């Protein structure tokens, strides 16, 4: 599917971003993060996404962008139709194929469409409207299949990792909506709309595959924020295990953890002794506003403002400002372009669209 023409207002915004974008460091990592797009097939969103891709392609020509990450809630799921949800996902994928850099997706809580399965006034969901992981994988997550250093977990799991050799950095893409699909009659025991967490399978993959033989620096990206108090985000099953694994990895320690649970059980051993690692940041979306701070596990955590329409929900960020979001203007979206310099150990984000640039004080 061809992009719509590059809007004049978006060209001006791209030029302003290009002027502010620092020269990419010799060993630097640069990536774009577009979260909570809530895409649907209307002209307004086709234009906004076309402008985003035109912008990133133009910036990529002069200042290489290593990848574009869609941070979950990639599709809007506003029609209560499974077929329309899948069609929107396919159109989104077709537009993203115009990007000149690798595109990697993570899953958000709106992406399986289970919100339309909910029994009235409850968070209990019947089966019928949900879009399973394998369909999401085949449409959106295969966009990364041509990326040389991307390693999917396999078996159509919606997580993987990407190595950036020139930056001595790995980026781990987690699935924070990784709940098992179990039916109790016609009721889903867990639904991805309101239930968050990590199965034992994903945690074991993290400890013994994604973090095995890792380079010095490792970023984590998922949909749900890692910092839960400031963002008022929902609790996640096995979040404590995720944090235990991550701390042991960073500190160069061994671990053996287990949990006896029918659906979220695990028994994981890993040995990270002999080398410590740096985790510059753990990055998420979901809350629809910009934030940063130290998360409960002691790591630096960042969220990025939603990239979708105003009626998807705008909120005040850390600076107390409600930024504009107006269609067919330079504020129609928000995309962070992160630049990490491992030599100087600095991390900045340059904002395309609504919001401001940020200079993070990483540890």
Task: Show the residue positions of the predicted features.
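N-terminal active-site segment of His-dependent metallophosphoesterases
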Residues: 1-86
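Conserved beta-sheet core of the metallophosphoesterase superfamily
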Residues: 234-341
